[in-house]
Regions:
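Residue-level signal for the start and early helices of compact helical domains
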Residues: 1, 7-8, 33, 39, ...
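Active-site beta-strand->loop segment that positions catalytic residues and contacts the acyl thioester
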Residues: 33-55
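Ser/Thr- (and often Asn-) enriched beta-sheet segments in non-cytosolic proteins
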Residues: 3-5, 49, 76
């Protein structure tokens, strides 16, 4: 069993760890290619236990219950080509998230 703590500087939505950071933290801890499913908001600044479940998965848990489940595997993606420079500049200037965002602290 391993204890992991998500520092508040890695905040995602309010009072919750950033999902990508949490998944990366689990993968780094296990030193493996894994698929992770978040099943509850990951609490911040709280010791979480990462332990095998006996059925081929690892479970990250808080005192309240499971936070994430991980299993060995890789995600296969067809990565699209990047945009042209002019398109990227235009998109960066017109992205509405710079003016208003559902999770501005994320």
């Amino acid at each position: 069993m391993t204890t992991l703590t998500i520092g508040s500087r890695f905040k995602g939505p309010p009072e919750s760890g950033n999902g990508g950071y949490v998944c990366g933290l689990i993968a780094t801890s296990l030193q493996a290619d894994i698929k992770v499913r978040l099943v509850a908001p990951p609490p911040l600044d709280t010791p979480l236990e990462l332990a095998p479940d006996g059925e081929g998965q690892w479970v990250l848990s808080s005192a309240a219950g499971p936070v994430a489940r991980a299993l060995a595997g890789r995600i296969q993606l067809d990565v699209p080509s990047p945009p042209q420079y002019v398109q990227a500049v235009w998109a960066s200037q017109h992205y509405p998230g710079f003016r208003e965002h559902a999770f501005p602290d994320c």
